[in-house]
Amino acid sequence: MVKQKSPLTVGVIGTGAIARDQHLPYWRELEEEGRVHIVGLCDIVKARREEEAAKCRAAKTYSDMRKMLSENRFDIIDVCTQNRFHSVATIAGLQAGANVLVEKPMAMNVKECEAMIAAAKKARKKLMVAQHMRFEARAQKLKEVITSGACGEIYTAETKWLRRRGVPGWGKFHIAKESLGGPLIDIGVHMMDLCVWLMGCPKPVAASGKVYRKFGDRKDFFNADWGTPYPPKEFDVEDYATAFVRFEGGLTMQMQVSWAANVHDEIENMYILGDKGGVGINPLGFFSADHDSLNHTTWDWLSAEDGHRREVRHFCECVEQNLPVMVKPEESLRIQKIIDAIYLSSAKNREIVIK
């Protein structure tokens, strides 16, 4: 008879919106399947942590993550805090002997990311940044097409995610010391990660960019239905960013992201271009040409399964079976290097070399 493995023990640090809506539902699903046991939830807001604990089987609640880590043994720690706590919470989890899944962005700067990777290597534990868009069916389909060679030699990518009005009106997304930046660090990190992954994770060598703050700090700013109003004087991040990134081998990427811009409607799009064909997200398809026709194949039947669900289940499986994670921390470090270079480029008005 095969001995039944004990459920993995899971702890979650930070029980705000991202944990409540996109992480904990899937850990509870795994708990119902008998694969994990949610042991502890940590948050500085008592009502928030207790509300989520009530949905679990027997999770204890804590206001201090170090107390939670010292009183329990965890196989997995899921870090869902504000950006500025990602590094310290991740390193604490790794040092306590847990494998760590941490929400994007990886951290506030390259130095913090490097410290997280060093801690994971020292502890010999898994570390993965929650780049859920890689796990979506549409991304998996595009990766399949590119990997098949149908696009030929990939040479450039273009991505944009422009919200007409969509500054997050919850948490502290709009405060630089808490989050680092605005849409570049919030939604730009998703688009850049997906682009670079689809291109085969080339090494970035230089970036130029510009960030703007034109709407978020205005008293007359209309933010549509994006949470509760915030004091305009608190808004000190960008609400629009544009960038051009160069990679080894001559590959390039262009990007535009916004929380607020005077466009017709929200735009989310991406193209990865090769010399034989290209792929895009809206519409989701493969585009090519031969000597007498333009060809395109589109897909609208792909699974609607949430990328967050696939991401959580993937990380659980990696820990269960000692498998490599899809989002390698070194890849996330490269994305952070690009982000840091874009902000520096904007400040200095010149291209920044990425080492």
Cite the ranges covered by each PLM segment.
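Rossmann-fold dehydrogenase core element
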Residues: A115-H132, G152-A157
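Hydrophobic residues in well-ordered beta-strands that form the structural core
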Residues: V102, L127-V129, E158, M255, ...
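N-terminal Rossmann-like dinucleotide-binding module
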Residues: M1-C56
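Beta-loop-alpha module in the N-terminal Rossmann-like domain of NAD(P)-dependent dehydrogenases
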Residues: C56-A119
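Predominantly a Rossmann-like dinucleotide-binding segment in NAD(P)-dependent oxidoreductases
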Residues: I18, M133-E234, N349
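Contiguous beta-strand/loop segments that form the cofactor/metal-binding neighborhood of enzyme cores
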Residues: D193-G285, V312-L323
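C-terminal helix-rich "cap/oligomerization" subdomain common to oxidoreductases
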Residues: M1-P7, V12-I13, I76-D78, E114, ...
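Active-site loop of classical SDR/Rossmann-like NAD(P)-dependent oxidoreductases
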Residues: I18, A47, I281, W301-R313
